[in-house]
């Protein structure tokens, strides 16, 4: 009985040895195995067993030349030849590698299968054992993350389209107690591309919805801002002196109301003042302080507290001007940021003191002029999606290609 058990163990070992060596020299692996391809060029295809036993998976099975030779001599595949001195092996010249044509690639693709649902700690041997009675599998590629962790899915190449189809169409397949997702490899990539397109569309829709929500919030904030400023606009007009400036207005109302913004340029005949509080109160106080005759540089002026739609439109324009001035200030700040003492632009800026904020019809604190400079914007280029199967990622292993 013990002898029968030993014989069974040896037969199982020999089968594994044959399977592993025939995989190394097989149609799928050999064209991709750079190291082995270099070896077979050295001696008419012969590779010393001394080299072969350095391949990790074969090494774990045996390093005994006699065991390897005995196993190959019993193989029904008749793929391998053994040298007369029994120290070298090679793929039989009578069974040349298939030419890698588009037709051949398409054939391999049609018998390639995607399987998902394995535990992430599953070993290749576990998966090979599970596939043993599912048809002849020529290659197993364990799909991994960038950090080499197993993703729980594989690509398996069957020996024929028929066996691959039979496997895919077998219902209710499980690995242990886990249901498996099984698809042809081509169908898997089609499904993934459809999912990517769907995700892209959903992302665009979410972005659009978020943008609309932001726009709505901005509009609500703008309306709230407008409501807070209702009654705070005072328009002035008349045959104003050409030298009339914002400082004149600040001086005129300095003790009667806090000015937040002046919409006016030197030489214009009208403008608008935005007060922090109600404009009528500031106007009444200023008139009272000037005996009812409120002038600018000894020129008669018509003063009008804006109301209704005219007021709202004027407020919107002022808010836009404020934002434009703020953006230009931020842009100029970025350009000057980090300038050294030797920089001419920095020296010029430091000589003038602080930067003044004034563009067309806009003003914060002074009447000095400044250049109008816009900020450049970077444009992101969208990545193009493809419906085609991406180039295969070669898994680096002990002998070059594949996981098997």
UniProtKB/Swiss-Prot annotation:
The modification Phosphoserine is found at residues 92, 94, 225, 366. Residues 381-391 have a biased composition (Basic and acidic residues). GO terms for biological process: positive regulation of translation; tRNA processing. One of its GO terms (cellular component) is cytosol. InterPro entries: La_dom_prot, La_HTH, La_xRRM, Lupus_La, Nucleotide-bd_a/b_plait_sf, RBD_domain_sf, RRM_dom, WH-like_DNA-bd_sf. This is Lupus La protein homolog. Residues 329-342 have a biased composition (Basic residues). The modification N6-acetyllysine is found at residues 116, 128, 328, 341, 360. Residues 7-99 form the HTH La-type RNA-binding domain. Interacts with DDX15. May interact with RUFY1. Residues 111-187 form the RRM domain. Residues 329-404 are annotated as: Disordered. Binds to the 3' poly(U) terminus of nascent RNA polymerase III transcripts, protecting them from exonuclease digestion and facilitating their folding and maturation. PROSITE patterns: HTH_LA (PS50961), RRM (PS50102), XRRM (PS51939). The gene is SSB. GO terms for molecular function: mRNA binding.
